Amino acid sequence: MSEKVDFYDFEKLLDKAYEELPENVKHHHSRFEVPPAQVTIAGNRTIIENFVDIAEAMNRDPNHLLKFILREVATAGTLEGRRAILQGRFTPYLIANKMKKYLKEFVICPVCGSPDTKIIKKGRFHFLKCEACGAETPIQHL
């Protein structure tokens, strides 16, 4: 009863798993961080000074993020250069909460938690496609 058992070396298994990762995930060594919104209230307007920087950190179209924020706070607004201008007075706390909600719904993969995602359209439906695990999750259309 002397069967030969072939145990895999952990390091070899780890190397094999690493080789299977997509190229864009292999080279992602930094922690995912979104810069905090720099909110200024001027009269009856709220200005998010670093709006485009935030959208770029999330790897999303600034217009998509703006559309979400405007719907969430029920107001009108525009993009001017690298900043967003909203009609009305909104606290930095409220803006930060809406950014977190956007991250949860349209950026972070609900399957593996990776921020390496993109929004794709198949027919009439929109999906959040994860570059790390390959999951496709249906999302609401804005």
From Swiss-Prot:
Coiled coil: none annotated. InterPro entries: IF2/IF5, TIF2_bsu_arc, Transl_init_fac_IF2/IF5_dom, Transl_init_fac_IF2/IF5_N, Transl_init_fac_IF2/IF5_Zn-bd. Keywords: Initiation factor, Protein biosynthesis. The keyword Protein biosynthesis applies. It comes from the Archaea. GO terms for molecular function: translation initiation factor activity. The keyword rRNA processing does not apply. NCBIfam families: aIF-2beta, PRK03988.1. Heterotrimer composed of an alpha, a beta and a gamma chain. eIF-2 functions in the early steps of protein synthesis by forming a ternary complex with GTP and initiator tRNA. Belongs to the eIF-2-beta/eIF-5 family. This is Translation initiation factor 2 subunit beta. It comes from Thermococcus kodakarensis (strain ATCC BAA-918 / JCM 12380 / KOD1) (Pyrococcus kodakaraensis (strain KOD1)). The gene is eif2b.
